[in-house]
Regions:
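Short, basic/aromatic-enriched C-terminal tail that caps enzymatic domains
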Residues: 246-256
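Short acidic/polar capping segments at secondary-structure boundaries
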Residues: 110, 161, 170, 200-201, ...
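Surface-exposed beta-strand edges and their flanking turn/coil or helix-capping segments
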Residues: 69-71, 77-82, 118, 168, ...
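Feature captures the catalytic cores and cofactor-binding loops of soluble hydro-lyases/lyases
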Residues: 171-248
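Solvent-exposed, non-transmembrane amphipathic alpha-helical segments
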Residues: 83, 97, 150-157, 180, ...
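A general structural motif
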Residues: 137, 141-149, 167-179, 197-199
Length: 256
């Protein structure tokens, strides 16, 4: 990876500043460090992503604590509830309120977490459409370019359009936020693919499955439990997706 992925050097003063515009609302902060190399040591100022602990409270009960970026919190709550199988969809969520470091959620009825359904879908995607989404994943990852400290997730529509894009310090929360954002916009996830930068573990595959995606793709590696779950559910799972190749571990019939 080229040196400029994280920061651009400026001779005077000795600081790192990213190529991205300085957005005062972005979840990062400047901090000092010492660079040690064959040329010796020097003081630098770099940007780092902000991580905060957010508590998820559902119907008066704390169910989870997430370490994530303190942004897009409604999307996080909606996506988390759907991806964890706690609600069927946004219509089952009565309200989401942010109170300090907590997200207070109310829902209609209850649903068990292991609500997996075998995928029955005729959705198909061309590799070039997927590679185009991966290119956009890199282009839109502005906080990653400033800090090197985030994962990204993108909801890719059947025709190649982008339903949502989110970054987070947590790969799970990036997926939750992308799902929540797409659902709040009324997107039918059964006609979409989840594109992400994180490893495809069973946790991530389970989230994607509960949300209703037939296809999940990552530019990173899969894990065996994630592959096994995708096969059991009839999902398409592809990883190491980097132009001009991707490796399909389950459901290759959906990739044209």
């Amino acid at each position: 990876m080229k040196e400029s992925w994280h920061a651009d050097r400026i001779e005077e003063p000795e600081e790192f500043w990213q190529e991205e515009r300085l957005d005062p609302s972005a979840a990062f902060q400047a901090t000092g460090c010492i660079e040690i190399s064959g040329k010796g040591r020097r003081k630098l100022k770099v940007d780092v992503a902000i991580e905060e602990r957010i508590k998820i409270v559902i119907d008066g009960t704390a169910v989870a604590e997430l370490f994530c970026l303190p942004s897009e919190l409604e999307e996080l709550a909606v996506g988390f509830l759907v991806c964890e199988g706690l609600v069927e969809g946004p219509a089952d969520i009565v309200s989401v309120q942010s109170e300090g470091k907590s997200l207070i959620c109310e829902r209609r009825g209850q649903r068990g977490e292991e609500n997996f359904h075998r995928v029955v879908s005729d959705l198909k995607m061309n590799p070039e459409t997927i590679f185009g989404a991966l290119d956009l994943l890199n282009q839109e990852a502005r906080l990653w370019r400033r800090t090197g400290g985030t994962h990204s997730a993108l909801v890719l529509r059947e025709g190649g359009g982008i339903a949502s894009f989110c970054e987070d310090v947590s790969r799970s929360s990036a997926v939750d936020k992308a799902v929540g954002s797409a659902l709040l916009a009324g997107t039918d996830l059964s006609r979409c693919a989840m594109i992400t930068t994180g490893r495809l573990s069973s946790v991530i595959v389970a989230k994607v499955a509960r949300a209703g995606f037939p296809i999940v793709v990552s530019r990173a590696a899969p894990l065996n439990a994630g592959i096994d779950l995708a096969k059991r559910l009839g999902m398409t799972l592809a990883a190491f997706a980097r132009r001009p190749k991707l490796h399909v571990y389950s459901g290759d019939g959906r990739i044209l």
